[in-house]
Amino acid sequence: MMIMVKKGSDPEVVEIDEIEGLGLELEEESTTSKKKKKEKEIKSIEDLPGVGPATAEKLREAGFDTLEAIAVASPIELKEVAGISEGAALKIIQAARKAANLGTFMRADEYLKKRESIGRISTGSKSLDKLLGGGIETQAITEVFGEFGSGKCFARDTEVYYENDTVPHMESIEEMYSKYASMNGELPFDNGYAVPLDNVFVYTLDIASGEIKKTRASYIYREKVEKLIEIKLSSGYSLKVTPSHPVLLFRDGLQWVPAAEVKPGDVVVGVREEVLRRRIISKGELEFHEVSSVRIIDYNNWVYDLVIPETHNFIAPNGLVLHNTQLAHTLAVMVQLPPEEGGLNGSVIWIDTENTFRPERIREIAKNRGLDPDEVLKHIYVARAFNSNHQMLLVQQAEDKIKELLNTDKPVKLLIVDSLTSHFRSEYIGRGALAERQQKLAKHLADLHRLANLYEIAVFVTNQVQARPDAFFGDPTRPIGGHILAHSATLRVYLRKGKGGKRVARLIDAPHLPEGEAVFRITEKGIED
């Protein structure tokens, strides 16, 4: 170091000045090295720049209790929960990303190696697993839509009881279809047609609680079949349904059994006829009918089905409980299996928006797969979402449960949202509300992606379909959610009914897989080839 001094200056002063200057330089170097050292030693939230004890406490209370959680947050989120400026929030996030090694570039071969650690949950069907690249992926959102018109239908003369604004109607399901088709029009769907319903309510039995209540019917569906199963009861009633249609029996408790498997001597469960006719609906008013005969009959005509989103059944005027469509419990059982059997040794979180979760179905699948039904049920955590805000809140609360089970022998490995869009669709009606709905849905999907990536879990969502009025060719339906959901879901699978009671899954979008189809069946074991 060189210091310029005046002539005649004391050399000792120069020396001292040089030493002081040198000390200043050493101090600067020491400060720089300390800064670097400090940056390298970020191991907790308090180590982040600008985060003191008070801010750290606010972040933890809001669920941002790890560097990874902060790294994937948005500046606006941190600004709101911590009461800091957006600029300060951005600096905190950037430091967290650097400390957690997120947001940096990685060579493709290294990324490929990282993807080898991704877990997959078997669906129970080898053909469907192959279509999905090995099963339902962790760190991804898999969307399934189009499960509608499942082939579980009734003969055209089946009587139905329904209400419009408390005005009762009792007529055949064929007459009901014709009436609403003339008002609302019918849409081609799968092997038949569907008519949207508005302000139509039926009485339904909640199997889980045993309660009878009034609920909304969303669609009425029809298709043609050649043969039906006729089930005659000792009370004089009879059912004419397709072979795969579930019938509510009393076999070691209440359970749904496909019509083709019903035998003489079985007991069909219904609701007391006089209770329904007086419209005095109360809990526990059940009656039982013994099956006297079961036979296959030639039919070659239209069969019909009502779509009941909430409980998937409705009560006919004769008191019999009639089932409609229901699926998606298999994964909740399969994920609990060890990896060598297609699972991930994991627990399940199920966010239920339409009251579609059925523990009875879980028990049936688990029992037929040789598992302890009670143990399987213990590792499924269910919450009912009553509106879109509640649904989004439950995703945030799900993170608490994920953290709670993180270091146990059954960490959460599957998050199910059934259905993803039903509340958004019913609450935000019309073009004027579309922008707000899509923004809210985008935030919801971002939260799901964050959980999937941060905790290495699989997110499985079901979706509804709607008609495309401008579609003159091809499939006239499309999934709800628009471009927001189309671009956010990692894999999109379209389900439709095939011939002979089989189902067809079509992979329509995936970043690493070709489009294709797989055929599978729904049995007492869930999904099978």
From Swiss-Prot:
<dbReference type="GO" id="GO:0005524">
    <property type="term" value="F:ATP binding"/>
</dbReference>
<dbReference type="InterPro" id="IPR030934">
    <property type="entry name" value="Intein_C"/>
</dbReference>
<dbReference type="GO" id="GO:0016539">
    <property type="term" value="P:intein-mediated protein splicing"/>
</dbReference>
<keyword id="KW-0067">ATP-binding</keyword>
<keyword id="KW-0238">DNA-binding</keyword>
<dbReference type="GO" id="GO:0003684">
    <property type="term" value="F:damaged DNA binding"/>
</dbReference>
<keyword id="KW-0233">DNA recombination</keyword>
<keyword id="KW-0547">Nucleotide-binding</keyword>
<dbReference type="InterPro" id="IPR003586">
    <property type="entry name" value="Hint_dom_C"/>
</dbReference>
<comment type="similarity">
    <text>Belongs to the eukaryotic RecA-like protein family.</text>
</comment>
<keyword id="KW-0651">Protein splicing</keyword>
<dbReference type="GO" id="GO:0006281">
    <property type="term" value="P:DNA repair"/>
</dbReference>
<dbReference type="InterPro" id="IPR020587">
    <property type="entry name" value="RecA_monomer-monomer_interface"/>
</dbReference>
<dbReference type="Pfam" id="PF14890">
    <property type="entry name" value="Intein_splicing"/>
</dbReference>
<comment type="function">
    <text>Involved in DNA repair and in homologous recombination. Binds and assemble on single-stranded DNA to form a nucleoprotein filament. Hydrolyzes ATP in a ssDNA-dependent manner and promotes DNA strand exchange between homologous DNA molecules.</text>
</comment>
<dbReference type="InterPro" id="IPR006141">
    <property type="entry name" value="Intein_N"/>
</dbReference>
<dbReference type="InterPro" id="IPR027417">
    <property type="entry name" value="P-loop_NTPase"/>
</dbReference>
<dbReference type="InterPro" id="IPR036844">
    <property type="entry name" value="Hint_dom_sf"/>
</dbReference>
<dbReference type="GO" id="GO:0140664">
    <property type="term" value="F:ATP-dependent DNA damage sensor activity"/>
</dbReference>
<keyword id="KW-0068">Autocatalytic cleavage</keyword>
<dbReference type="InterPro" id="IPR003583">
    <property type="entry name" value="Hlx-hairpin-Hlx_DNA-bd_motif"/>
</dbReference>
<dbReference type="InterPro" id="IPR013632">
    <property type="entry name" value="DNA_recomb/repair_Rad51_C"/>
</dbReference>
<dbReference type="Pfam" id="PF14520">
    <property type="entry name" value="HHH_5"/>
</dbReference>
<dbReference type="InterPro" id="IPR003587">
    <property type="entry name" value="Hint_dom_N"/>
</dbReference>
<dbReference type="InterPro" id="IPR020588">
    <property type="entry name" value="RecA_ATP-bd"/>
</dbReference>
<dbReference type="InterPro" id="IPR011938">
    <property type="entry name" value="DNA_recomb/repair_RadA"/>
</dbReference>
<dbReference type="InterPro" id="IPR010995">
    <property type="entry name" value="DNA_repair_Rad51/TF_NusA_a-hlx"/>
</dbReference>
<protein>
    <recommendedName>
        <fullName>DNA repair and recombination protein RadA</fullName>
    </recommendedName>
</protein>
<dbReference type="Pfam" id="PF08423">
    <property type="entry name" value="Rad51"/>
</dbReference>
<keyword id="KW-0227">DNA damage</keyword>
<dbReference type="GO" id="GO:0006310">
    <property type="term" value="P:DNA recombination"/>
</dbReference>
